[in-house]
UniProtKB/Swiss-Prot annotation:
It comes from Bos taurus (Bovine). Residues 500-510 have a biased composition (Acidic residues). The keyword Phosphoprotein applies. GO terms for biological process: transcription by RNA polymerase II. Residues 64-74 have a biased composition (Pro residues). Disulfide bonds: none annotated. Residues 85-96, 269-282, 511-530 have a biased composition (Basic and acidic residues). The gene is RPAP1. GO terms for cellular component: DNA-directed RNA polymerase complex; nucleus. Residues 34-53, 62-96, 269-312, 498-530 are annotated as: Disordered. Belongs to the RPAP1 family. The modification Phosphothreonine is found at residue 321. Its main location: nucleus. This is RNA polymerase II-associated protein 1. Part of an RNA polymerase II complex that contains POLR2A, POLR2B, POLR2C, POLR2D, POLR2E, POLR2F, POLR2G, POLR2H, POLR2I, POLR2J, POLR2K, POLR2L, RPAP1, FCP1 plus the general transcription factors TFIIB and TFIIF.
Amino acid sequence: MLSRPKPGESEVDLLRFQSQFLAAGATPAVQLVKKGSRRAGDANLEQPPLQDHRDVVMLDSLPDLPPALVPAPPKRARPSPGHLLPEHEDPEERLHRHDQHITAVLTKIIERDTSSMPVNLPVSSGVAFPPVFHRSQGRQGKPVTAGKRSIFAQEIAARRASGAKVSPVREVESILDPPESAMTCEALTPREWGSQPPWNSYSFQGPHLVTGKGLKGQEAEQEAQTIHEENVARLQALAPEEILQEQQRLLAQLDPSLVAFLKSHSCTREQAEEKATREQRPGRPSAEVIGKEAIAPTSASVPRQENELEPETPALALPVTPQKEWLHMDTVELEKLHWTQDLPPLRRQQTQERMQARFSLQGELLAPDMDLPTHLGLHHHGEEAERAGYSLQELFHLTRSQVSQQRALALHVLAQVIGRAQAGEFGDRLVGSVLHLLLDAGFLFLLRFSLDDRVDGVIAAAVRALRALLVAPGDEELLDSTFSWYHGALMFALMPSQEDKEDEDEDEEPPAEKAKTKSPEEGNRPPSDLARHDIIKGLLATNLLPRLRYVLEVTCPGPSVVLDILTVLIRLARHSLESATRVLECPRLVETVVREFLPTSWSPMGSGPTSSLHRVPCAPAMKLLRVLASASRNIAARLLSGFDLRSRLSRFIAEDPQDLALPLEEAETLSTEAFRLWAVAASYGLGSDLYRELYPVLMQALQDVPKELSSPPPRPLAVQRIASLLTLLTQLTLAAGHIAPEHNSHSAEASLLAGSSSVTWTQVSGLQPLVEPCLRQTLKLLPRPEMWSALGPVPTACLLFLDAYYQAWSQQPGLCPEDWLQDMERLSEGLLLPLLKHPSLGSLWDSLGCCSPLCNPQSCAVAPETISSLASLGCAGGHPPLSLAGSASPFPFLTALLSLLNTLGRIHKGLCGQLATVLAAPGLQDYFLRCVAPVAALHLTPFSAWALRHEYHLQYLALTLAQRAATLQPPMSGTDAALCHGMALALLGRLLPGSEHLAHELMLSCVFRLEFLPERASGGPEAADFSDRLSLGSGGDLGCGRGALLAQACQDLPSIRSCYLTHCSLARASLLASQALYRGELQRVPALLLPVPKEPLLPTDWPFLPLIQLYHRASDTPSGLPPADTVGTALRALQWVLVLESWRPRALWAVSPAARLARLMCVFLVDSELFRETPIQRLVAALLARLCQPEVLSNLNLDCPLPGLTSFPDLYANFLEHFEAVSFGDHLFGALILLPLQRRFSVTLRLALFGEHVGALRALGLPLTQLPVSLECYTAPPEDNLALLQLYFRALVTGALRPRWCPVLYAVAVAHVNSFIFSQDPNNSDEIKAACRSMLQKTWLLTDEGLRQHLLHYKLPNSALPEGFELYPQLPPLRQQYLQKLRISGVLPNGVSDT
C-alpha cells in the first residue's frame, strides 16, 4: 500500500510514487466520471441498478411490438433513454413512442422498491387481552369535546394520538440499531424468507439513514448509495471488538435516559412486528424428521445475537402503568409474567441430528421446521416451546393431568397417532416404530388405568385409543367379505405365534381343556409380563372385561363408545378359544349385550344420528355373538340355549330390512349378521329347528334374489346379504344330508351324536330350482369385469350351494341314484360344460398367477407397524384388485367351481373325463409351473397364512380332479402327469395346520400314485450307466443299477405309501376335526377357529422323516435293540428318496445337500447291522452317487447350521466312533467317512480323524477307484494347518497310515507333507519355517526307503496308479538346490544319497 507524501519530499518523489502506482496496476481510490451531455445518455447503461433484486414478471407470450397497421414515420435520430425530447417535437410522434402497445406495460413488471419507506405497524400490547378502561384515565386525559362520542371512540382516538407521538422517534431508533430496524420493518416476499442473509454478515439492503434529500433526482440516489456502500465496507472491515467499542462510545455521548426510553419502546414495537410477521409468513412444506440438511439461520435469530453483543439489557417496561389505587402493584414480579411473552423464534436445524417427533391434534406428523400460528393450539410451554405440536412424552405427561379435558385430549391424540401409524402414513420419516415405543413406555396399562376414570369423556377417549391399538383397520372388513368363500367362516386364531415356554407347553393339551384349565405359572405371572408376549392376555389379566361390562351397563355411553367396545370385544374373541370363553363367562357381559343391543322391540329410529344405542338393535352386537360361536361348538350351544338367540334370529330374519324400524344400511347389516350367526350355528348342526319356522321367509328371500341382482349396479350390502343367505342354506343342506351313526358303534360317540339334525331332505330339496337360476343370471355378467366384481361372493355362494346339494342328495339312502345322476348330467351339459369353454373363464385362469401369494409374495407384505405381541392381518392399506383378497380375485369363484366339479366327478364317474378338461386351461398349467418352481419359503404372518390357506384349497381341488381323471380315463400325458405330481409334492410340504385332512388325502391319492410317475419306463438306462461308473463294490452287477432300483421302487409304491402314512401321521384329534370340516360331517365339527399356524404341517425334509424317527428311536432305546421292522422302514424311505432324487429333484430343493448327507449318515447310526443289508447298501450307494455329482457337490456346505443337529462336527464325531466299532472296513461306510474330509471343508473334521480316531485309518480300505469324488478334491490346495500336517507326518512315520490299509488318505497325506517340506514361501513365519526344516530333516533320515522315496519324489495325484500319485524318477533341480542349500547350512547331514 502506497503511503501519503511526507513533509520534506519533493515533486520528484511524487512523480516516482505515481510511476510505481501505474506500474503496479492498482485500482485508484477515486474514479473520475465525466458527466455527459443530454445525448450521451448511453454512458450510464452499464451502471448497476440502484434498487435491490425484486420480483420481475415477464410476459413472453405477448409480442414486443403491435402489428404494423399504419407505417410509423421515419426516425430522425436515436435518442438516449435518459434524454428529454425538445419542445418542438411533434406530440403525435411523442405519443406513439411512449404509448405504443400493451406490451410496453405488461411485458416487464418490476416490484416497487419499498426498502426506504417506513412501515408503521400498530402498537401492540404486552398482555393477552385489551386493557380494561378505567374511569381514572378519563380524569387524567383531556376533557371530551364532543359529548356524543362513545367510550370506544374516545379510546381509539387516544391510541391514535399516542401513536402519532411515538412515530417521530423512529428515526432516532434507527441510529442506535439500523440493521434491526431495517430488517424488522421490511416485509419480505415468501421467496425471500428462505434466502435471507444472517445478521452477522452485515449485508444490508440499502441506505436508511442518509436519504440524499436536497440533491437532484438520480444524483440523490447515487450519492446515498455510494455513502451506504462506504459505510458497509467500513463495518465489514471492523472486528467485533471494535464494533462494541464504537457502540459504547456512541452510547456514552447520548443521554442515558434517552437511550433507555428509546430501547424500551423499540423492544415493544419489535415484538409486535415479529408477531405480525410470523402470522403473515406462509407455512413451509413438510419435511422429514430425520435427514435434515444444514440451513442458514434466518432473521428470526437476530435478537438473541444482538443481546449477546450488548453489555447489559435494561428491564422490560410494563405493558400498563400501575396506579396507586391498585393493590399489591408496588413490586413487579417479572418472572411470573414470563409466560405472557411471545414465543421465541423458530430455530431451524443446523445439522442432520434427529429431532423429537411432534404431532398435531389430529395425529399428523409435523415437520421440524414447520412454523404454524399459535391460535391452532399446538404451542405450549414445554421443551422447545417455539416448535408446534406435541411429542409422545408430552402427551403421556398430559394424560396424568388433573384436568379431565386435557386427559381426554391426550388420549384422543394418541389414538389418532396409532391409527395413522398402522395406516403407514409415517413411512420412513420416523426412526423406529411408534407402536413399539408406546408399548415400551407402558401405554397399554395407561389405557387400562384411564378406563377406570370417573369422567365419561376420558373413558370414551380411552376406549377409542384401545380400539385403535387392538383392532387393525381393514381386518374385520376382509373377514366379513370372505365369509361366503369356500370354508370362509374358518379363521386362524389371531394370537402371537412366538410365545414363551409356558404357552408352548400348553399346546400339547386339547383346546377345550386349555380354555378351562390354566397353568399356575401363568396365573401368578404379572400382567406386564404377559403383555410383553401377548397384549390381549395381559389386558385380560387386568380385569378388562368386567370394566367394559360396567361401562356398557352402568354408564350408558354414547353410540361411538358402544361401537368401540363391541369392536374390542370382537377382537378379544378372535384371539383364541380361551379369550372367547372368558368373554362368554364374564358375569353379565353377554347378557348386557343381548339385552341392550339386541332387543326384540324398540322405538323407531330416524335417519339422522342417534344419541344412544341402548335398547336399539346393533349389528356389531350380532357379529360379536357370531365370532364367539365360531370359537367352539360348546360356546355356540351355550349361546343358543342360554340367551334366547332363536327368538332374536327369528325377529331380525323374518322381517325385511326395509320394514325394520332402523336406518336401511343398519337394517341390512343386522340382517346379514343374523344370517351369518345362524350359518355358524348350522355349521355345528345346531339351530336347524328354526328352519321349519322360517321356511316361508327364506323361500321368499330366495325368490327376491334375482330382482336384487338385476338392479344395476348391485348394492354391496345387498350382495353380502344374499351371499350370507346362500351360505346359510348351504349349511342347512349339509345338515339335511347328514346320516346319524349307529348307536352300537362307540358309546361315547353315540351319546355325543345322539341328537341328529332336525332338517330333512324333503325340506331342502326344493331350494336347488331357486338357486340355479340365480347362478345362471350371475354368469351372464362374467364377460363384464366391472359388473362381475360388483357381484362379490354371490356366484361363489351359488356354486357352493350346488356342491352341498348334490353331496347331500347322493347320501340319501332311500332315493333312486338314477334321479341325481340324470340331474347332474343335465346341469353339466346345460351349464358347466359351456362355462368351461367360455373365453371369460380362461381370463380368470390366466389371472391366477398375478393374484397368487406364492407367485407374488409382495401381496403378503408385512404391515408398516407390526407388533410381535399383537397379531393382525395388516389390511390397513387395503388390497389391490389383482390380489387374492382383491375385488378382481379369481380364487373364490374358481375354487368353488373346482369343488363342484370334484363332487360331480366323484358321484358320477362318467362325467369325470368331460369335467377334467378344465385342467387343460393354459392359465392353470402356467400357474402350476410357477408354483412348482423352487422358491424361498414364504414367511408366515397372519395374513399370509390366511391367504395361503385359500390358495391351497384351489390347488388341492385341482389335483384331486386330476387324480380322478387319471384313474378313470386313459393315461395322462407325461408332461401333465409329472406337473401334477410335482404340484402335489410341493403342496404337501406347504399345507398349514387345520388342513390335516388335505395332507392325508394327498398322501393317499396323489403323492404315491403310479399314474403320476410317467418316468418309470424311461429312467432305467441313464441311471444304470451312472451307477456303473460310480459303483461301490458292486462287482459290475447290472441288477443293482439305479434303473433296477427305481423300477423296484415303483412296484413297491403301496408299501412306501403305508410307511409314510405311519411315520408322517398327524395328530389324531386334529385329523378328525379337519376331516369333519372338509367332509361336511357337521355333528363332528369341534370349532371353526383354527390353531395358530406357526409352521407347515410337515417339515421340509419330510421324505427323510422315517429315517430320522428310526435314528431317534435307536438313540432313546437303552438296550440298543433296533425297533421292529427297521429294515423295511429304512428300505421304503430310501426307495422314495431315490425316486425323488432321480425324477423330482425340485421336491428336495429345500433340503440342502449337507442335510441330505446327514440323513444318510443316520442310516448307519441306527444299529450295527442295518447298513450291511444288500438292498440298503445299493440304495445308499445310489443316493451317495447322486450327492457326489459335480453340480450337487459344489453346493455341499458343512459349515451351515442344519435343522435337527447341533453341528455337523458333533455328528461326524459320533459317526467316527460308530465306524471304529462296527464297520469292519465296509467300503460304503468308508466312503461316507471320506466325503467330508475334502480340503475345502472344515479342518476340524480332519483333525478329529487323525487326532482322536487315528485307529479308524486301518479300516478305511476304500480303493482309489471307488472314491466317489476326484482325488484332487483332497490334495488341492496345499494344507496350511500346522497341527494337521504334523499329524499327517506322525501317522506316516509311525505306520498308522499305510497304502494297503488306507490308500486314499495315504496319498492325501503324502501330497500335503511333500508340499509342506519343500515350500519356500518367504512370507511364512519363523515357526512354520522351523517346522518345515525339522520335518524335512526327519524325512531325510527315514529308514523306510519307500516312504522316504514317496515324500521326496512326489509329483502329482493320479488315482489310476496303485499308490494314488506319480513320482519323479529323480529329484527335480529346484528340490536338489534346496536340499544342497540345507546341507551346506548344516540342517541336513552329509553322506546320505539324494536318490
